[in-house]
């Protein structure tokens, strides 16, 4: 994977080969307000997703880092002002100290919002995991990624896909030598349904808890190439300590 990662980190989800775009494949348009923890990271344009974990902090992928970020919450159609959005600038952006941009190990970052958001039916936090999700756990992945394998069709409406956590042995067999203990695979070995990464930094929520962060993958919904996600259960202490210190 290392050589391929030279092509990565362009703000959208990391997906290889380059002729396969980031997108949700085999998914559906999320019901409005059904993913109230989903945020859009904006720098004059939508470039990544993230997850609201309390009224002033967002979790995303470290490879989504920019010096300044506006966090957009309460979004469904990201190209229309629907009246329920909250736009808040970042006050602090903190990447994991052991993030490796070459291997994408520890691909996680925290964003402190300049002011707390108002929590309501459209904007709500998602709990951190109380334990790691076992293989077979069903999860919801969401994002505004491109919907075409070739070409560009960025959806206005938030897209969702349902997929299971895969056994770690299957994950490692799909990407020999590239999977660390801080990564999980979610999807289908037969292909056909995949976030492909949807949008980098976006959520993987299983049984109501944030278990994954969209990180990288090879192609889109390809057989034996499931999506790879940051394993959030390994970072609960780091998240809580970082929030307490900032």
Swiss-Prot record:
Primary localization: secreted
Keyword Cell membrane included in the entry's annotation: no
Subcellular location, record wording: Secreted, Extracellular space
Catalytic activity, EC: 3.4.21.4
Record keywords, A-Z: Calcium, Digestion, Disulfide bond, Hydrolase, Metal-binding, Protease, Secreted, Serine protease, Signal, Zymogen
Site (Required for specificity): 194
Free-text remark on how the cofactor is bound: Binds 1 Ca(2+) ion per subunit.
Family: Belongs to the peptidase S1 family.
The protein's name in its UniProt record: Anionic trypsin-2
Originating gene: Prss2
């Amino acid at each position: 994977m290392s050589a391929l990662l030279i092509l990565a980190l362009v703000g959208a989800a990391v997906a290889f080969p380059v002729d396969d775009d980031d997108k949700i494949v085999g998914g559906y348009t999320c019901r409005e307000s059904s993913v109230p923890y989903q945020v859009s990271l904006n720098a004059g344009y939508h470039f990544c997703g993230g997850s609201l974990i309390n009224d002033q902090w967002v979790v995303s992928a470290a490879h989504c880092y920019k010096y300044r970020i506006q966090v957009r919450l309460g979004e469904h159609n990201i190209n229309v002002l629907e009246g329920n959005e909250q736009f808040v600038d970042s006050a602090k952006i903190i990447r994991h100290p052991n993030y490796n941009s070459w291997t994408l190990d520890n691909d996680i970052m925290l964003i402190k919002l300049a002011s707390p958001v108002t929590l309501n039916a459209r904007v709500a936090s998602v709990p951190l995991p109380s334990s790691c999700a076992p293989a077979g756990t069903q999860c919801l992945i969401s994002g505004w990624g491109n919907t075409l394998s070739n070409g560009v069709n960025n959806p206005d409406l938030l897209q969702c896909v349902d997929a299971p956590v895969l056994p770690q042995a299957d994950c490692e067999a799909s990407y020999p030598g590239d999977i660390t203990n801080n990564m999980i695979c979610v999807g289908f070995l037969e292909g056909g349904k995949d976030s492909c990464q949807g949008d980098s930094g976006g959520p993987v929520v299983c049984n109501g808890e944030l278990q994954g962060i969209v990180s990288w993958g090879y192609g889109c919904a390809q057989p034996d190439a499931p999506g790879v996600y940051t394993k959030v259960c390994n970072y609960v202490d780091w998240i809580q300590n970082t929030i307490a210190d900032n």
